[in-house]
Amino acid sequence: MSLQIDAVILAGGMARRMGGNDKGLVELQAQPMIKHAIDRIKPQVREILINANRNQTRYAEFGYQVISDEDSGYLGPLAGMITAMGQTQAKYLLVVPCDCPLLPADLVERMLSQLEKENADLAVASDGKREQPVVLLLKPELRDSMKAFLDAGERKIDFWYAKHNCAVADFSDQPNAFVNVNTPEQKQQLSEAIAK
């Protein structure tokens, strides 16, 4: 457990591709997807925040602080991140989505190592083929930069990354760690793969 790192699990989206069902609460292997994410990151961080814009009471049942976007317009992952950045007192904030049930057990360790090695402002995970834009470790002091970005009407997360010294943490040895579930079909495929 790191005393300098808190985490936010992003569960604030509209889940259009999941038929509007709240992805964090969709069951995979008999438990809500967010529970898989919690179990994976809990040993790696000090505190966990859950960013949710609906079903807040249900999310609170997991025993962690639930925060809703400061702006209620469903502005995407940056809105959840900026809200969490304003809530944490930690040196770093880990950001993960609620629909990645196979996150690495060494996620924080490797991301922090890469961030410090490059003296970067943030580190984003890569599965070896592509970067995972909502799996990152960042300094909460970047909040003002993110606020200015959002206030300018910007929403593309990678455009915001480009404004900062961004390290890339390589997880090509764990290519399935960032498999996420956006559709009922993907949920079924992942459930079958886990059961094997």
Swiss-Prot record:
Q: Which Gene3D superfamilies match?
A: Spore Coat Polysaccharide Biosynthesis Protein SpsA, Chain A (3.90.550.10)
The free-text function statement in the UniProt record for this protein reads: Transfers a GMP moiety from GTP to Mo-molybdopterin (Mo-MPT) cofactor (Moco or molybdenum cofactor) to form Mo-molybdopterin guanine dinucleotide (Mo-MGD) cofactor.
SUPFAM superfamilies assigned? Nucleotide-diphospho-sugar transferases (SSF53448)
Query: Could you state a single Gene Ontology molecular function term?
Result: GTP binding
Binding sites annotated in the UniProt record for GTP:
L10, A11, G12, K23, N51, D69, D99
Primary location recorded for the protein, binned into one broad class: cytoplasm
Q: What is this protein called?
A: Molybdenum cofactor guanylyltransferase
